[in-house]
Curated annotation (Swiss-Prot):
GO terms for cellular component: membrane. InterPro entries: Cyt_P450, Cyt_P450_CS, Cyt_P450_E_CYP52_ascomycetes, Cyt_P450_E_CYP52_fungi, Cyt_P450_E_grp-II, Cyt_P450_sf. This is Cytochrome P450 monooxygenase FPY7. Disulfide bonds: none annotated. Heme binds at residue 465. Keywords: Heme, Iron, Membrane, Metal-binding, Monooxygenase, Oxidoreductase, Transmembrane, Transmembrane helix. Gene3D superfamilies: Cytochrome P450. Its EC number is 1.-.-.-. GO terms for molecular function: heme binding; iron ion binding; oxidoreductase activity, acting on paired donors, with incorporation or reduction of molecular oxygen, reduced flavin or flavoprotein as one donor, and incorporation of one atom of oxygen. Induction: Expression is induced in the presence of 6mM glutamine. It comes from Fusarium mangiferae (Mango malformation disease fungus).
C-alpha cells in the first residue's frame, strides 16, 4: 500500500485553498464592482430625472430588518385596525408618500393620485406583479393576475370578449340568481346577509365563467358544496401566505392546504374537460356550431376553449377570475347594505327611484338610469373598497413624480426591486380630495364629483378591472330588486364596521339585519 507523503497532502490542500480563496476574492470583487457601477448609474439616473431624497421616512428602531415595523403591522392586523392605522397614523403623521427602508429593501407607501397614476399607467411597463406568483401559482397554475408582459397581454385579450357590453347587458342569468337570493331572505328575522351574498356571487360567478352554476343558494350538489368550502379556505390561506411574506419558508408541511387547492382545481377541470371534448368534436365535424349545445350566456370557458389555448391555461384563467370576482362583489354589496340598514333615509330615496319600474326584469339601460343607486355604490366603494390596498414591484430603476424635496413635490427615485404600495382605503378618505365630511357616507357628493385617479376601487390603467361594469350592474340589479321587495332594512348589530382583510375586505362581524315588506 502506497503511503502519500504529508508534504504532498499539504501542497494539495494548499492548492485547494488557494483556488477557493481566489474564487472568493473574484466573487467579492465582482459584487463590489457591480455595486459601485450600480451606485454610479443610479446617481446619474437621479440627476437626469431631477430626483430628490424622499421627504418622509418612517423611523424604525430596527433599520436592518424592520422587526418593530413588522410586529406593529401584525398587532394592528390582529386587532383589525390595519387600514385605520395606515389612514390615521402613518399617512397623516408621516406623509402621503413615505419610505420604509429595511436594510437594502425599500418600500414606498403612497396615497398621492399622481404617483399611483404613474405606477398604473404612465410607467406601466416599469412595474409588475412577479411577487404574486409564489402565492397564486399553487392554486391557479398561472393566469392573468400573476403574469406580466406579452403573457399578460395575451390573457387580457382572451378575457375581454366575456366582459364586453353585450355580455354584461344580458341580465337574464344574473336576475335568475337574484330571484333565488330574494327567496332566501326571511322577513322580520335577524340573519347574516353577508353569508347569502357570498353564496349568491358564487352562483352567478360560476355560471358566468363556467356556463354552469354551483347553485349554492337553492340546490347545491355535494361536489359544489365541497368546492365552495375549499374555495373559501383557499382565499383565506392565500391571504395568510401573503401576510407571512419571507417567513413562508419556515412553515411546516403544507400538504393539507395543497390538498384543498387540488379540490378547487379538480372541480374546475371537470368543466374544462367537457369544453375541450366539445371543441374536439367540433373540429372533427361530429358537432357543428349550429347544433352545438346553446346557453343563453356565452361563458368564459366556452370562449377560451374555442380560442385553442391549452387545458392548463383555461383552468388557470377561470380560477384567477373567480378568485378576483367572488368576494369583490359580495363585499361590495355587504358593505353597502351594512350602511343602508343604518340609514333609512337613504333606503327611502332608493325605493323612490326604483318605484317607477313596473318590472322585476329590467333592461340594462333601465339599470344605468338608477342614478342615486349608483351614487350609493360609489360611496360604498369609496369608504369601504373591497380591495383596500395594492402594490407593484419596480422591474427597473424608475421614478415617481412626487415625494421628494423639502415640500414633497420633487420626483423620487424608485430603485429596481423596490415595492410601491398604495392604500386606496386611505386615499378615499383624504379630506383635501373629498371635503371635510370625507369620513361620512353621503351619496349626494357624487352629483358634482367626477371620479379621477383619486377614486380607484377597480384599479386603473391597462390593468383596470375587466369586470368593473359587470360588478356594478350586478349590484344595481340586487339593489333594485331588494328595493322593490322590501320596505325597510333594520340593522340588528350595533357594532361599528370593522375590517376583515383577506384577499378582499368586508365587515368582520358580518351584516346582521332584518328585512320588512308590505303584507
Amino acid at each position: 500500500m502506497a503511503i502519500i507523503p504529508w508534504k504532498a497532502i499539504d501542497e494539495s490542500l494548499s492548492l485547494r485553498w488557494k483556488i477557493i480563496v481566489t474564487l472568493l476574492a473574484i466573487y467579492t470583487l465582482r459584487i463590489i464592482g457591480t455595486r459601485i457601477t450600480t451606485t454610479r448609474a443610479r446617481r446619474k439616473f437621479r440627476e437626469q430625472h431631477g430626483c430628490a431624497p424622499v421627504t418622509c421616512q418612517l423611523p424604525l428602531k430596527d433599520p436592518f430588518f424592520g422587526i418593530d415595523f413588522i410586529l406593529k403591522l401584525m398587532r394592528v392586523f390582529k386587532e383589525k385596525r390595519l387600514l385605520e392605522t395606515f389612514a390615521n397614523d402613518f399617512y397623516k403623521t408621516v406623509g402621503i408618500t413615505f419610505l420604509v427602508e429595511r436594510g437594502s429593501q425599500q418600500t414606498i407607501f403612497t396615497i398621492d393620485p399622481e404617483n399611483i397614476k404613474t405606477v398604473l399607467a404612465l410607467k406601466f411597463k416599469d412595474y409588475g406583479l412577479a411577487f404574486r406568483a409564489p402565492l397564486f401559482n399553487p392554486v391557479t397554475g398561472g393566469g392573468m393576475f400573476v403574469s406580466d408582459g406579452e403573457e399578460w397581454a395575451h390573457s387580457r385579450a382572451l378575457m375581454r370578449p366575456t366582459f364586453a357590453r353585450d355580455q354584461v347587458a344580458d341580465l337574464a342569468l344574473t336576475n335568475r340568481h337574484v330571484t333565488d337570493l330574494v327567496s332566501k331572505i326571511p322577513i322580520n328575522t335577524t340573519f347574516n346577509l353577508q353569508e347569502l351574498l357570498f353564496d349568491f356571487t358564487m352562483d352567478t360567478g360560476t355560471e358566468f365563467l363556467f356556463g354552469e352554476s354551483t347553485d349554492t343558494l337553492c340546490n347545491p350538489t355535494k361536489a359544489s358544496q365541497e368546492f365552495t368550502k375549499a374555495f373559501d379556505f383557499t382565499l383565506k390561506d392565500v391571504a395568510y401566505q401573503a401576510r407571512l411574506g419571507p417567513l413562508r419558508r419556515f412553515q411546516g408541511s403544507r400538504s393539507k392546504a395543497l390538498e384543498v387547492y387540488q379540490v378547487c382545481r379538480s372541480y374546475v377541470e371537470r368543466y374544462v374537460d367537457q369544453a375541450m371534448a366539445l371543441r374536439t368534436s367540433t373540429l372533427t365535424g361530429e358537432v357543428t356550431r349550429e347544433n352545438e349545445p346553446q346557453n343563453r350566456h356565452d361563458s368564459l370557458l366556452r370562449q377560451l376553449a374555442r380560442s385553442g389555448v391549452s387545458k392548463e391555461k383555461i383552468r388557470a384563467e377561470l380560477l384567477s377570475v373567480l378568485i378576483a370576482a367572488r368576494d369583490t362583489t359580495s363585499n361590495l354589496l355587504g358593505n353597502l347594505f351594512f350602511v343602508l340598514a343604518r340609514r333609512p333615509d337613504i333606503w327611502t330615496k332608493i325605493r323612490d327611484e326604483v318605484k317607477h319600474l313596473d318590472t322585476n326584469e329590467p333592461t340594462y339601460e333601465q339599470l344605468r338610469h338608477l342614478t342615486y343607486a349608483k351614487y350609493c355604490i360609489n360611496e360604498s366603494l369609496r369608504l369601504h373598497p373591497p380591495v383596500p390596498s395594492n402594490g407593484r414591484m419596480a422591474y427597473r430603476d424608475t421614478i415617481l413624480p412626487h415625494g421628494g424635496g423639502p415640500n414633497g413635490d420633487h420626483p423620487i427615485h424608485v430603485p429596481k426591486g423596490s415595492m410601491v404600495n398604495y392604500t386606496v382605503y386611505a386615499m378615499h378618505r383624504r379630506k383635501d380630495l373629498y371635503g371635510q365630511d370625507a369620513e361620512e357616507f353621503r351619496p349626494e357628493r357624487w352629483e358634482s364629483l367626477r371620479p379621477s385617479w383619486f377614486f380607484l376601487p377597480f384599479n386603473g390603467g391597462p390593468r383596470i378591472c375587466l369586470g368593473q361594469q359587470y360588478a356594478i350592474t350586478e349590484s344595481l340589479l340586487v339593489i333594485m330588486r331588494f328595493a322593490q321587495e322590501f320596505t325597510s332594512i333594520q340593522s340588528m348589530d350595533a357594532k361599528p364596521w370593522t375590517e376583515e382583510i383577506a384577499l378582499g375586505c368586508g365587515n368582520a362581524n358580518g351584516v346582521y339585519v332584518s328585512f320588512q315588506k308590505l303584507k
